Regions:
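Alpha-helical residues within the helix-turn-helix
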Residues: 14, 25, 54
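A short, Lys/Arg-rich alpha-helix, primarily the initiator
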Residues: 1-15
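DNA major-groove recognition helix of helix-turn-helix
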Residues: 38, 48, 67
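Short, charged recognition helix plus adjacent turn
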Residues: 64-75
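DNA major-groove recognition helix of helix-turn-helix/homeodomain DNA-binding modules
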Residues: 47-62
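Short alpha-helical DNA-recognition segment
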Residues: 17-36
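Residue-level signal for the short linker/turn that defines the boundary of a DNA-recognition helix
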Residues: 7, 17-18, 44-47
Length: 75
């Protein structure tokens, strides 16, 4: 699991007052998948990460904890 991703996903979901079921319905997965993302037991695919960023109105960089000016997070 990518460090910090589970926390960011839960933080964003709660920010918009979305239930795990609502997010799961939007991504066409089960609520247990969303729970797994938020606990770090599962890692979302690139496709699901993009869908989550769209749903949460944020960039994938934000969800991944990347900062453009931070050399430690640059690939």
């Amino acid at each position: 699991m990518i460090k910090g991703l589970p926390e960011k996903l839960k933080e964003q979901r709660e920010k918009y007052h979305y239930s795990q079921k609502y997010v799961a319905d939007q991504l066409h997965v089960s609520p247990s998948i969303i729970s797994g993302y938020e606990t770090g037991e599962r890692t979302p695919s690139t496709e699901k990460l993009l869908a989550l960023s769209y749903l949460y109105h944020c960039s994938t960089d934000y969800l991944l904890g990347r900062k453009h000016d931070d050399p430690e997070t640059m690939i």
